[in-house]
């Protein structure tokens, strides 16, 4: 589904057998490389450079595929091959750090900018190599150049610390976020009563620029007309997608209060996570059915929604609650407890898949499986327990 899709498809047809048989890639890896702008060139570059990158530079085929699976994958691979020795030998980076920088969109430009600016950022501005790498891996070329330009000003004139500037820059859109902080921090502090730390917290996420501008625009209305506090507005804005979450609160808070009897505190709790907008919209849509048809309380629905991935968790509860209760013997409270963590959807789906095997084949009780699932990282914990019981590791 790209302008160069014809060339990519023809190249997959031509190179897939060789990449799989001679180079050990899977068909899925070949497709991943091809499914970006410039997929044809990326596949040809993988075929050309994979042996050398693995043999001479110690990369794994998986790392080569990860670097190639972006727009501009060809350029990223060629630049990494060219700069890896210099960045490691002359600039003190680890091979993994170079690979990580290359494995993001704009990897070529980010690597070239690290080579150019790392000495100055470390020697003249006091940043560490790890900080430069963090900026390059997220904000890329533009963020590194913005840090070079604005670091002294933001620290000297605005009172920020170097760590705060790095935190703002180390996100997608870091350049724009730094410029927004330079422009809006005095206004947000003087006119709206925010602290520097609050402004930094809002800016230190993907989309920080938009979130800061939206806070400036909506803070008076959200506080005066909707009864929120400044701290609540900041909490909503201080996540990926903060702009969208604030606008969703502005739009849905009156409806959720009037039609669904939610409190402002509950609405804020739902909105104050990555994906807050989607979670609020899903609560509005699914709360009546979850309460009337599935017997949940509004408080339980809010608890499920008030995590990263709340939208997906609510939709999965709607789909799996009847099955998990009727066929697997879980109580509603147990399903809610499992769903009420970040990644609730994945945990519920993994529980549905592994619960019968863990109980019947490995002798765990229902309560033991539920206890494993009812924490952050529940999906990974269930899969690790299953793997260990299926093929015991003597070291454990």
Residue positions per predicted region:
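Accessible peptide chain termini
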Residues: 1-3, 396
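Thr-biased low-complexity repeat/linker tracts and other Thr-enriched repetitive architectures
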Residues: 3-380
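Leucine-rich solenoid repeat scaffolds
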Residues: 373-378, 382-395
């Amino acid at each position: 589904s790209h302008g160069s899709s014809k060339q990519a498809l023809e190249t997959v047809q031509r190179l897939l057998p060789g990449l799989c048989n001679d180079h050990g890639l899977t068909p899925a890896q070949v497709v991943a490389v091809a499914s970006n702008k410039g997929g044809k060139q990326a596949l040809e570059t993988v075929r050309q450079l994979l042996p050398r990158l693995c043999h001479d530079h110690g990369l794994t085929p998986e790392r080569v595929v990860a670097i190639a699976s972006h727009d501009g994958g060809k350029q990223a691979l060629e630049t990494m091959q060219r700069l890896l020795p210099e960045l490691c030998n002359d600039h003190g980076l680890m091979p993994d750090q170079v690979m990580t920088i290359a494995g993001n969109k704009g990897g070529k430009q980010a690597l070239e900018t690290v080579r150019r600016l790392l000495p100055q950022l470390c020697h003249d501005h006091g940043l560490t190599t790890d900080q430069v790498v963090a900026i390059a891996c997220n904000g890329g070329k533009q963020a590194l150049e913005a840090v070079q330009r604005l670091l002294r000003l933001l620290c000297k004139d605005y009172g920020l610390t170097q760590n705060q500037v790095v935190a703002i820059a180390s996100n997608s859109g870091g350049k724009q976020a730094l410029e927004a902080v330079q422009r809006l921090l005095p206004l947000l502090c003087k006119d709206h009563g925010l602290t520097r730390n609050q402004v930094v917290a809002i800016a230190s996420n993907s989309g920080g620029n938009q979130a800061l501008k939206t806070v400036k625009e909506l803070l008076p209305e959200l506080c005066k007309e909707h009864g929120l506090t400044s701290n609540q507005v900041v909490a909503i804005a201080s996540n990926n997608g903060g702009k969208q979450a604030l606008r969703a609160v502005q739009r849905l808070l009156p409806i959720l209060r009037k039609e669904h009897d939610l409190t402002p505190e509950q609405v804020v709790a739902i909105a104050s996570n990555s994906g807050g907008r989607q979670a609020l919209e899903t609560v509005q849509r699914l709360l009546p059915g979850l309460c009337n048809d599935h017997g949940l309380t509004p408080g339980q629905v809010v608890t499920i929604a008030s995590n990263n991935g709340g939208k997906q968790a609510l939709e999965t509860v709607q789909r799996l609650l009847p099955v998990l209760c009727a066929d697997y013997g879980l109580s509603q409270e147990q399903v809610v407890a499992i769903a009420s963590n970040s990644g609730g959807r994945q945990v519920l789906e993994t529980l549905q898949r592994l619960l019968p095997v863990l109980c019947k084949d490995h002798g765990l009780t229902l309560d033991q499986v539920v206890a494993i699932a009812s924490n952050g990282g529940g999906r990974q914990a269930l899969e690790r327990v299953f793997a260990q019981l299926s093929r015991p590791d003597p070291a454990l």
